[in-house]
């Protein structure tokens, strides 16, 4: 088996005015999967597809304490085998409020879209089963939190909720020592507390 990918990406940033910044960009990745003949099998299969993306972001600094950021991304594929092409528009929004010079509160709402890779859809070793009908995963993440810098520490506390439809995950069949990637819905709600310590040299 051989997986190959290559692509290009570009983006540009504009300072619209002292309180607003816009970013626009695109990316393209061409993927190729080849199941090459071996001494054990003469099977020769090849698949390819193009992954396209267009995205934009607007950052608005309302005042010294409040900043809002919104973003949009369109993702689509072309050239996929068996007509397995997809298209999705996802959005994101963030609000940042500075409490003081060293601490801030924030709110994030982000939609996600993740295509399955060829290495998840097609076997890359003898233990993996093919999953050619694997679907993209779509989700939404909500997070509200607090950050603070103090004395070489970066403190963070956050409450989050994740809801993903068709989450891509590997299922292991221990009885047959094999695994296969599948889609299953996933939800998770939790609290995250962390402390990042920075040394004198960073």
Q: Which residue ranges define each predicted feature?
A:
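Face-selective signature of the C-terminal outer-membrane beta-barrel domain
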Residues: 1-86, 92, 96-98, 153-159, ...
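Outer membrane beta-barrel strand-and-loop segments of large Gram-negative receptors
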Residues: 5-12, 47, 51-55, 131-135, ...
